[in-house]
Amino acid sequence: MRYAKAAAAGVLILILSSTLSSQNTPSDRVGGAAQILTADDVRAVLTTAATALGNDTLAAAVVDRTGNILGVYARPGADERTPDIAVSVARTGAMFANDQAPLSSRTVRFISGTHFPPGIKNTPNAALYGVENINRGCRVDVQGDAVFNAPFPRPKSIAGVFGEGAGSTPLPCEPSDTRGCARGGPMLDDAGETLPSVGITTGKADVFDAGQDQPGAVPVNPGGIPIYRGGKVIGGVGVAGVAANLAEYAATLAAAGSGRGMDFSEPLGKPGAVLIDGLRLPFFGTCTTITCIRNTLRTRPAGSFPGQLSSGTFVVQPRDGLQAPENYVLGPRASSLAGGLSEEDVRRIIDQSVAVSLRTRAMIRLPINQPARMTISVSDEAGTILALYRMADGTVFSSDVAMTKARNAYYFSTREGYEVLRSIAASSQQDKYTWTPEPPAGKGWAITARTISFAGQPLFPPGIDLGEQLEEQDSEPQHGPWFDLYVFDSKNACTEGPGASRGGNRAFLNQSGIVWFPGSVPLYRGDRVIGGLGVSGDGVEQDDYVSLLGSDGFHPPDALRVDNSVMTDAKGRHVRLPYLKLPRNPDIQK
């Protein structure tokens, strides 16, 4: 109880930041060098989590802001997957938070389902639909991690980083061998089997997002909390293997670090919480006031009891963390392909994207009227990443996302990508779709991440899930034309679909999965697609906005944009496919 009481007092500083409005970390103090988590810090955080609860099934993990595993603790009753789930929820807290607004794994679940708000039928999908399929640890380049300008670890599983015995040879994570890919979850596939690789744990039950039609009962994993020091994100802590309320209780106490000064030093600015479409994003339980959170933390959850560190073992011994690199994390460099993007082209696209970001009003930063801080990536025709640029304090999950979005934007805009998508739509297990008209000979439609998201959900059009409301009195909602591709992606980490060969090499390594939420455009020279631009780090409309303006000079011909085409289901109903969606009044107000 000594640890829990000390932590409860300190953690209120963090909780204040998610509830009340006052001041905020000034823009000129956002990003830059931050104190790293030391091995002693990690041990203190895990000790607090361990002593908060005595459950024999508990596991806890600490990661730095890059998602690098710094320490994992588990009790004998924890099942095989629980330590990796703790790592995954810790990453969710660390990699989604920013210096101006703490977000937790509860927050991420709220904004990643088939409905927004969760549990309300016939409402649009949440912005980050499919987020569990990102950050699975896929290889970035055939040359390995040496292509990065600074150390930037891939978020793999414990065995993928340390080996089967958490200290031997690491296991790989690539299309041909995914044994070392991240193992969050548990989440089930379409056959009811546990998916082997889930990068981000939110509590999503299965690929159909079961439970989204039950207001107040949507499944969630709320045990991932960011760790702050001096107003800057330096890592995250995750607790798993216990009931949701217990995991959140222990993780939030542990985030205070037993009084070691880990705190969000200033409360958030107006309006005191991040709002999307007028809805307050949750951080801790159902609380919306400081009094509620304080009382919750000061009162031990019913039926729980304190624990001892000696009741478990360190699966991964505590170690020091890393800084999260900023600016050019990779590149800039030219494509090696004839007629491809030059280094000058790449720099121009990055510079344009950064300039647009700095004038774009952020959705996830406070106080309001702050600039968006994006992570931006450019890919060439081979899927080679030519640049990865992280603006100061950009969300770290966005690095994997931006690179993958860039690759997807190019690949699915090629003729090969078109044929793969057309075939999947035509052979959908539940509904057969016809995609018309066909693009010009030898070409594909110019496709974005928004297009892929729109047609890749278990409901089509997205959010429409009551079949009896339709004129034809359908017995059940229909899956999207590319929902089967989402299922394939969920089962097969680090691939771009069943036909992603890029010239016939099925083991091609320049693949890192598919991103199912918006923020990308293909890059063209004339009517030839030569690469892709991926943007991540704020609201998805803001990501689309920066993608569009950042790619100035490389837009597709209007006649090749996918919004010239429609999907038609077996009953003859037509749905036009979207290209981009831009925010209203996107720029910072003077």
Locate predicted features.
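Bacterial N-terminal signal peptides
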Residues: 8-19
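Bacterial N-terminal signal peptides that target proteins for export
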Residues: 1-8
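Flexible, solvent-exposed loop/hinge segments and secondary-structure transition points
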Residues: 23-590
